[in-house]
Regions:
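Von Willebrand factor
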Residues: 31-141, 143-145, 177-180, 213-217
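Exposed acidic/Ser/Thr-rich ligand/metal-binding surfaces
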Residues: 33, 118-168
Length: 221
């Protein structure tokens, strides 16, 4: 009987040890969010930037300490850190985070007040710069927001016909306004979005379109 009891105790001890070891071996879950937002500044679309500013202010209200946020412009050659308007990783202290958000909002406001329209729209380059920034931020959830009509126009010589390594990045196209040609033939609009969806998914990302800006409540989930 004693031998039987000792065996039970030994087995229970081994099971408990195994559970403790397995619990210790699990890596902590990274709940931080990284958001990289691209603003189309080409042609008449620059007139839409006040809407983008409202979205940015909404996101600033939602993002938490240790989350990362960057806003960049889309112009003739967007694969460049020079196009980043402002970027930040929020401090762990709420009081510091509040001040960082205030500075961020002011930087964006200054940019929009003085923005100059770009003749070209290098969306792919902006996305690639966003992926690079998200890689460096090492956040748990990766989001690229593209405020644009999604009509890419590249300067002569720029090459963008390659797969972008989105690597589990969720890409959201916002406020995709319809061009005059889209109104004449709606298939152009649908085809344009389908091409972008295929490009994102080919690189291991996920794709979403939000045109009704009242539906932003789940954008960070």
């Amino acid at each position: 009987m004693r031998k039987f009891s000792f065996s039970i105790i030994l087995m229970a001890g081994l099971v408990l040890t195994g559970l403790l070891l397995s619990g210790c071996s699990k890596e902590p879950v990274n709940h931080t969010k990284g958001v990289y937002m691209l603003l189309d500044t080409s042609g008449t679309y620059a007139l839409e930037l006040k809407k983008a500013q409202n979205i940015i202010n909404y996101l600033l209200g939602k993002l938490q300490p240790l989350d990362s946020f960057a806003v960049a412009r889309i112009d003739s050659g967007s694969f460049s850190e020079k196009d980043i308007i402002h970027k930040v990783t929020f401090d762990s202290r709420p009081s510091m985070t509040t001040n960082q958000k205030r500075v961020f909002a002011q930087k964006v406001d200054d940019f929009i007040k003085g923005v100059k329209s770009s003749p070209y729209t290098d969306i792919s380059g902006g996305m690639l710069q966003g992926v690079e920034w998200l890689d460096e931020s090492k956040t748990g959830k990766r989001i690229i927001l593209v405020f644009s009509d999604m009509e890419e126009e590249l300067p002569e010589g720029h090459k963008r016909d390659f797969t972008i390594p989105f690597n589990n990045t969720h890409v959201v196209a916002l406020n995709v306004t319809k061009l005059r040609s889209d109104i004449v033939d709606p298939r152009e609009y649908m085809d344009r979005l389908s091409v972008w969806q295929a490009k994102v998914e080919a690189g291991g990302g996920s794709w979403e379109v939000i045109n009704d800006l009242d539906n932003l409540q789940d954008i960070l989930d």
